[in-house]
Amino acid sequence: MQPVVETLSGLERRVDLAISVADVEKEVQAQLKRVARTAKVPGFRPGKAPMAMLERSHGPSVRYDVINSQVARAFEQAVEAAQLRVAGSPSLEPKTEGVDENTLAFSATFEVYPEVAVPDLSDLAVTRYETEVTDAEVDKTLDVLRKQRASYETREGRAAQDDDRIVLDFAGTIDGVPFEGGKAENFPFILGQGRMLPEFEEAARGLKAGDTKVFPLSFPEDYQGKEVAGKTAEFTITVKEVAEAVLPVVDAEFAKSLGQADADVEKLKADIRGNIEREVKVRSQGRTKTSVMDALVEAAKFDVPKSLVDNDVQGRIAQAREELKQRGVPNADSMPMPAEVFAVESERRVRLGLLVSELVKQQQLQAKPEQVRARIEEFAQNYEQPAQVVSYYLSDRQRRAEIEAIVLEDNVVAYVLEKAKVTDEKVPFDQLMGMA
């Protein structure tokens, strides 16, 4: 008789399972005989130990495995007969009431996948982001490259300004008491690069070699030095040297120093533009993808299995702990990480994943081999040896699968953009790159 599947609530189901004690014992004896051929029992040659002794030493573990195997088989048969897609693993509880001695009975509680209805994509409102790369962006990048290769010349009587290299002594106290890391001699830094706190840089700006200045400095609440975070210190600085940055001329020699094989300035600028355009494309597409995925998940109106959400939460907690360990945070494995902190985002990820999977299946948006190769080749252009990068990804199934997942998402985004209400938005370059 086919087991009856009971609907508890939402996606939760329950089914009663029964297996024969005789079938269990038959399988247990068969496995014990196989164990007997190789089991090492003191005082007996292999294969000669009495079955009663093997029953005592191996019987419980063999019986446990056999029962688990037969219950799992009964569960698979029950959900297959009911044509259910199980999400996660079932929770099993033994049943004794109304069960005869020849039967082992269990109650299996589990969740099923929801019926995923793809929303009407024409109702979605999404934004497609675009950013133009102009000569100004190329020139800014050239300036950054020049500053990275700057030399410095000491200027007597020069008032310190941005991009100058300053060498100074500093000493700080809090309530008159020195603190760790608050003192240094002949300390160099480039003014305006943000290496020092803004108040420190502002105090140094305009000073000349030989000048001394006393000023208050408030450490931010989230400052990395916990012993001074949120406190106000008094600093004394004495400038030893002010050196002006001397930038290299953009010429053939400069181009060659940056790896431009032909030492051609115009080719160097073209290379820079190409690199910027690739980065702009990645960031613009990333913003557009976020807009599309946000619209999809907002329109996804179906329940999600709690077991899948819980699995995602645990995965994210494990990932967070691993990241903390890599950053050298002590006791990362025992640090409290409440599941509810991750639950909302995990539910969103699961819901979006189910919807995207259904959309891919319905519209056949799977990544094609030629798309994967093209994406790898495009990505490889960011490296000095693109052919090696292409081979690196194509030769390994797991690495190739990573690119396939990206291409699949690209296919979904492209399909949604064809159907949805799209607003094109121009994003200023500095804003896109996080510089504004």
From Swiss-Prot:
The entry lists its GO molecular-function terms as:
peptidyl-prolyl cis-trans isomerase activity; protein folding chaperone; ribosome binding
Q: Reaction catalysed by this chain?
A: [protein]-peptidylproline (omega=180) = [protein]-peptidylproline (omega=0)
Q: Where in the cell is it found?
A: Cytoplasm
InterPro entries, sorted? PPIase_dom_sf, PPIase_FKBP_dom, Trig_fac, Trigger_fac_C, Trigger_fac_C_sf, Trigger_fac_ribosome-bd_bac, Trigger_fac_ribosome-bd_sf, Trigger_fact/SurA_dom_sf
Q: What is its main location?
A: cytoplasm
Q: Which domain of life is it from?
A: Bacteria
EC number(s): the record gives 5.2.1.8
Q: What class of enzyme is it?
A: isomerase
Q: Which Pfam families match?
A: FKBP_C, Trigger_C, Trigger_N
Q: Which residues form the PPIase FKBP-type domain?
A: 163-248
Q: Which NCBIfam families match?
A: tig
The free-text domain remark for this protein reads:
Consists of 3 domains; the N-terminus binds the ribosome, the middle domain has PPIase activity, while the C-terminus has intrinsic chaperone activity on its own.
Its name, as the record gives it, is Trigger factor
> What organism does the record attribute this protein to?
Bordetella avium (strain 197N)
Lineage in the entry? Bacteria, Pseudomonadati, Pseudomonadota, Betaproteobacteria, Burkholderiales
